[in-house]
Each structure stands twice: as C-alpha cells, then as structure tokens.
Amino acid sequence: MTLERTLSIIKPDAVGNNHIGEIIARFEKAGLRIVAAKMKQLDRKDAEGFYAVHKGRPFFEDLVGFMTTGPVMIMVLEGENAINKNREIMGATDPKKAAPGTIRADFAQTIDENAVHGSDAAETAKTEIEYFFKSQDVCARKR
C-alpha cells in the first residue's frame, strides 16, 4: 500500500445543495484524511488555469463557466492509495453510470454538474495540489 495525496474539489452544485459535510464524511469513513482545505470562489482565470489541460475541447467553456457559478470546497486528501480510493468514492463522471452509493450517484444531476473533482494520477495530483496550496499549507497528520 502506498500513502498518497490527491486533490478533491466539491463543485458549486454540491456546495450549493449543502452536501459538503456528507461528502467529507464519506472520505473520512473510507480512511482518507483532510490535510489541507479551503473554500474559494473561483474566477475565470482560476478555472481556466486549473482546467488548462482541457482547453480546446468542446466542453471547456461550459466547464469553466460552471466552476465559477459559486464557491467550491478544495481539499487535499491523504491516505493509502488515496487517488484510486477517492475515484471509487466519487463514482463515474456521468452520474447515470455511477455505481449506487457513490458521491456522483447520490448528489450529481448531470455529467456537467457532477458534484466533485478528483485527481486521476499521482503526477496530476501533485500538479493540482500545487495549483491551489503552498507546501506549508498542507499539514501532515500522524493520527
């Protein structure tokens, strides 16, 4: 088992529907620890920079627009195999295809407004964490 860190964002739809606590509880029940967190209203520059990898794809403008509609909760999660564990808890990108009991099956409405974002690989997690957090803002947790 590998101790990893991953970035998780609770998106504007889930924040607006007051699902922050329920989503965090699922991460913690799965053994993931929050080692950094902040609520932030993304502006266009923030969203475009974070999702720059998708620039030029048909959904880019809608994604950037959606991510700036309200505040988001941004967290660094830490735990054994945190990246894959987080992705399992989130469920498939399309909530209609997400397994029952996953965050997206329970809280997302559409593939565009799908409640959460999670890093997909170790390299991506590192880049995404550094986009939102300085290293001194990430707190190691021993217990």
From Swiss-Prot:
Cofactor: Mg(2+)
Keywords: ATP-binding, Cytoplasm, Kinase, Magnesium, Metal-binding, Nucleotide metabolism, Nucleotide-binding, Phosphoprotein, Transferase
Catalytic activity, EC: 2.7.4.6
Family: Belongs to the NDK family.
Keyword Metal-binding: yes
Name this protein carries in UniProt: Nucleoside diphosphate kinase 2
Protein's cellular compartments: Cytoplasm
InterPro entries: NDK-like_dom, NDK-like_dom_sf, Nucleoside_diP_kinase
Enzyme class: transferase
GO CC annotation: cytoplasm
Catalytic activity field: a 2'-deoxyribonucleoside 5'-diphosphate + ATP = a 2'-deoxyribonucleoside 5'-triphosphate + ADP; a ribonucleoside 5'-diphosphate + ATP = a ribonucleoside 5'-triphosphate + ADP
Biological process (GO), any one: UTP biosynthetic process
Pfam families: NDK
Membrane in keyword set: no
SUPFAM superfamilies in the cross-refs: Nucleoside diphosphate kinase, NDK (SSF54919)
Native organism taxonomy: Bacteria, Pseudomonadati, Chlamydiota, Chlamydiia, Parachlamydiales
Binding partners and assembly: Homotetramer.
CDD domains linked: NDPk_I
NCBIfam families according to UniProt: PRK00668.1
SMART domains: NDK
The organism's place on the tree of life at top rank: Bacteria
Function summary: Major role in the synthesis of nucleoside triphosphates other than ATP. The ATP gamma phosphate is transferred to the NDP beta phosphate via a ping-pong mechanism, using a phosphorylated active-site intermediate.
GO function terms (MF aspect): ATP binding; metal ion binding; nucleoside diphosphate kinase activity
